[in-house]
C-alpha cells in the first residue's frame, strides 16, 4: 500500500462520530499530598504538580476532550497505595483500571499480587528504574525472574 492510498482511506476517520469511539487515557497518576502520610512523588518543591490529583479534577479536564476513562499508573513505591488507588477507583467510573507497584523477588510479592489481582481493576504492575531500583541488576536474580 502506498502512503497516499493509506492517508486517503483514513482521512474520513477524523470526520467520523468521535462519541461512538470511547477514548481511554492510558497513563494518569492519582495522588493526594494532603493525606497524613503525604506522597513520595511529586516533591513539595514542584509548584505545578504538588496538589491533589484525584478523579474529580481529572474528569473536569478529560471529559470536555471526549475522554471516557483512564488507566491509573502507579506513582508510589508504597504497597498500601495500590489499595488506596483501588478504593478511589471503586468510587469513580472514570478510572477503568490501575497498573500498580509491587517488587518481584521480595518475600511478600506473591501475597500482595494475589491480594490485588482479585480486583478486576488491578491490571498489572510497572517495574523499572524507579524508586532507586535497578531493573538490570534484578534480572540476574532467580527470585525476581521466578516471580
Predicted ranges, named:
Residues 26-28, 75, 82:
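Generic detector of well-ordered alpha-helical packing
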Residues 1-11:
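N-terminal secretory signal peptides and thylakoid transit peptides that target proteins
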Residues 43-51, 56-79, 95-103, 123-130:
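Divalent metal-dependent hydrolysis catalytic cores, especially in the metallo-beta-lactamase
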Residues 40-43, 87-89:
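Glycine-rich, phosphate-binding/catalytic loops in enzymes
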Residues 19-20, 66, 94, 118:
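Residue-level preference for short coil/turn positions at secondary-structure junctions
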Residues 79-147:
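Active-site gating/metal-coordination segments in enzymes
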Amino acid at each position: 500500500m502506498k502512503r497516499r492510498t493509506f492517508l486517503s482511506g483514513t482521512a474520513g476517520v477524523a470526520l467520523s462520530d468521535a462519541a461512538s469511539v470511547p477514548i481511554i487515557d492510558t497513563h494518569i497518576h492519582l495522588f493526594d499530598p494532603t493525606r497524613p502520610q503525604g506522597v513520595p512523588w511529586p516533591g513539595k518543591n514542584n509548584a505545578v504538580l504538588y496538589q491533589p490529583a484525584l478523579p474529580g479534577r481529572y474528569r473536569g479536564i478529560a471529559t470536555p476532550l471526549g475522554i471516557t476513562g483512564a488507566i491509573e499508573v502507579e506513582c508510589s513505591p508504597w504497597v498500601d497505595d495500590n489499595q488506596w488507588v483501588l478504593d478511589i477507583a471503586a468510587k469513580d467510573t472514570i478510572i477503568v483500571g490501575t497498573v500498580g507497584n509491587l517488587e518481584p523477588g521480595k518475600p511478600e510479592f506473591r501475597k500482595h499480587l494475589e491480594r490485588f489481582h482479585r480486583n478486576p481493576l488491578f491490571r498489572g504492575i510497572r517495574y523499572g528504574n524507579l524508586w532507586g531500583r535497578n531493573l538490570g541488576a534484578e534480572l540476574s536474580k532467580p527470585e525476581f525472574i521466578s516471580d
